Amino acid sequence: MNVTELPYNKFIGIKRAKSSEYLLELDESPDYLNHLGNTHAGAQLSLAEAASGEYLLKLFKDSSDKLIPVVRRLESKFKKPANGKIFARAKSSPLALEIFKEELRLKGRSLIRIEVIIEDSNQVIIMTAFVEWYVQNVIDSTSI
């Protein structure tokens, strides 16, 4: 799967970041402006959700077709007005990853909370978010 090819992400223009420092980016566009002339919160949240999905795909690059991930919750904090191109990176703690993988192995489902940082082209943090994903293994109907 490629998150940049999902219809909504493609429609708004989310792309893989050119810099290896980030996962994804969203170009500046007058279409993304709010009533104050800054990048709309919805555009920032869309980038955050997509980046968390990209992070999850990278974690499970060899088995992503055997998993069903769904966003369960998204919490965000807007820190500064966003102007221009914006960039996203994501991470989760090693302990959270370990617990997530073990629970997924044992129960066939688990939750993981991914932190996303959105920055502008001056590397100023404009938004942080936590995206919680519910992930379950695909049930193989041939084994039933």
Question: What are the roles of these predicted feature ranges?
Answer:
Residues A82-N83, S93-I144:
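HotDog/MaoC-like acyl-thioester-processing domains
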Residues M1, E5-F11, T128:
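N-terminal intrinsically disordered, cationic/polar leader segments
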Residues D27-L57, D65-I68:
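Hot-dog-fold acyl-thioester-processing enzymes
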Residues G13-R16, V71-R73, R113, T128:
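Hydrophobic residues on conserved beta-strands that form the core of alpha/beta folds
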Residues P7-T39:
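Catalytic strand-loop segment that frames the active site of acyl-thioester-processing enzymes
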